[in-house]
Curated annotation (Swiss-Prot):
Pathway(s) where this gene product acts: Cofactor biosynthesis; coenzyme A biosynthesis
The enzyme's E.C. designation: 6.3.2.36
Catalyzed reactions per annotation: (R)-4-phosphopantoate + beta-alanine + ATP = (R)-4'-phosphopantothenate + AMP + diphosphate + H(+)
Keyword Metal-binding set for record: no
Keywords associated with the record: ATP-binding, Coenzyme A biosynthesis, Ligase, Nucleotide-binding
Disulfide bridge partners, by residue number: none
Protein name (Swiss-Prot/TrEMBL): 4-phosphopantoate--beta-alanine ligase
Entry binding sites for ATP: 17, 39, 181-182, 187-188, 199-200
Keyword check for Nucleotide-binding: yes
Coiled-coil positions: none
Amino acid sequence: MVKIPKSHPRYWSLYYREKIIEGMEKGMTAKAGLIAHGRGEAFDYLIGERTIEPAERAMRAAVAKLLLAENPVVSVNGNVAALVPKETIELARALNAKLEINLFYRTEDRVKAIAEELRKYDPEIELLGINPTKRIPGLEHERGKVDENGIWKADVVVVPLEDGDRTEALVRMGKFVITIDLNPLSRSARMADITIVDNIVRAYPRMTELAREMKDYSRGELIRIIEEYDNGKTLNDVLLHIRDRLTKLAEGGIWRKKQLD
């Protein structure tokens, strides 16, 4: 991994870009994952590279739903394993959720590489998806495979940085689907039950904080949070945030400004 000086004004952006490249070199991340990361980074620029209120609202609803779930599962793909392996394990622990390796471009080598990366942070962690025996209806080839004891039986599934086709297929199966996607226009964002429009490197640590905070909430409080949540409004509010921010930047000028609000 290329060493980036912390004095660089785009340190964190470059750092995570290198993590994705490293993930590909380790055999975890598919080439298409690099393209997906770049697309997400572009939307992160638009929202201001921070967690905005609609994302916070979505995270609270997502955590409430996961805490009430009987069989919650957090899906892990190559980009997730490259960017937030430790944070993924911490989130699953906080939610008492299972972890399943689930890949669009599935190969046994990629599954093995992701499992090895996750086990660096917890050698005893139970990982599902190593030998999946079930298939999501309507999805052909390797991308449709899921673990019988994981996503197949899950009532609530977290599918971060996910393909829209699979998100939609999981919804058709009757799963409650939560996605983390920086692109509010993507099919995953539009088809999920709860869409967290935020960078996963910010979202997972915050969701872990919320899980620890909300685990003592009453069942009634958690249900109220979910019932009051409107995913359509969340997506609309994200688009309005982007519009208003770009309008403000255009009116105030950006030429030679070192920082953009």
